[in-house]
Amino acid sequence: ANSIWPWSPGYRPQMPTFSETFPQVKKGAVISAVDLINGIGYYAGLRRIAVEGATGLYNTNYENKVAAALEALKTDDFVYLHIEASDEAGHEGDIDLKLLTIENLDTRAVGPIYEAVKDWDEPVAIAVLPDHPTPCELRTHTSEPIPFLIWYPGIEPDEVQVYDEVAACNGSYGVLKEDEFIKEFMK
């Protein structure tokens, strides 16, 4: 080698911890195969939970990630479970793979978490959302509004029956901006 090319050199961000922003969160965790997400979690004061088989790709071990999240929820007030697979499929421009990863997210992560926590004595809220769009036709991140779902015991559903970018804009929350989503979720 005759040169070194550092990727994304930077500095520590000046940001409050999650507990400083949301005092009801005394202890929280992040589960991700993506170093950037783990780093943000670290600066937000969340402990990193390493999961065997977490790849950040479509072959990630959903079951181990779900098991780790459910175990953490027994002691932590907040768990951020990040699954990168559909984003990577978007970067590859592979619509069939993207559909498979979304189906896997639904059947191997969201569904099992919901089934596990829906009757817990201590109520648990669930949010499902991408961190950004990655359309297959563009193969890069875009800045359109993203769909999201919030569930907690007793919440009344709105009229939206489809989980996509268009339908979500017509949901009871409408289009949220900046930090409105996390503030709404953490109420």
What role is predicted for each listed range?
Residues A1-K187:
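Feature captures the catalytic ectodomains and active-site-proximal regions of enzymes
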